[in-house]
Amino acid sequence: MIRILYLLVKPESMSHEQFRKECVVHFQMSAGMPGLHKYEVRLVAGNPTDTHVPYLDVGRIDAIGECWFASEEQYQVYMESDIRKAWFEHGKYFIGQLKPFVTEELV
């Protein structure tokens, strides 16, 4: 399974409520996406600083998204999809910045 995690920051000019609505629209647009096994998006509700190890300040993060793909082949199907291209265009509207991470399953 390939999983890509995205830290998302809304545009400065967008309200929190509008960002929330666009996250829902983006989730709805993911239905039936070729090659995409699963998509999740979660709004950041808080940012605790009482950690048991040194705190890493990465700035404001408004949401976390995650895309799942069953295989490299399915990821390529996704990347070549015209539907995915339209999905990315929507992302340009409501995502001001993002930081992606391809994760490796450990256990």
UniProtKB/Swiss-Prot annotation:
3-methylmuconolactone binds at residues 26, 39. Changing residue 26 to A: Almost loss of activity. Belongs to the MmlI family. One of its GO terms (molecular function) is isomerase activity. Optimum pH is 6.3-6.5. The gene is mmlI. Its EC number is 5.4.99.14. Isomerase involved in the degradation of 4-methylsalicylate and 5-methylsalicylate. Catalyzes the isomerization of the dead-end metabolite 4-methylmuconolactone (4-ML) to 3-methylmuconolactone (3-ML), which can then be further degraded through a modified 3-oxoadipate pathway. Can also use 1-methylbislactone but not 3-methyl-cis,cis-muconate. Inhibited by p-chloromercuribenzoate. Disulfide bonds: none annotated. Pfam families: MmlI. Keywords: Isomerase. This is 4-carboxymethyl-4-methylbutenolide mutase.
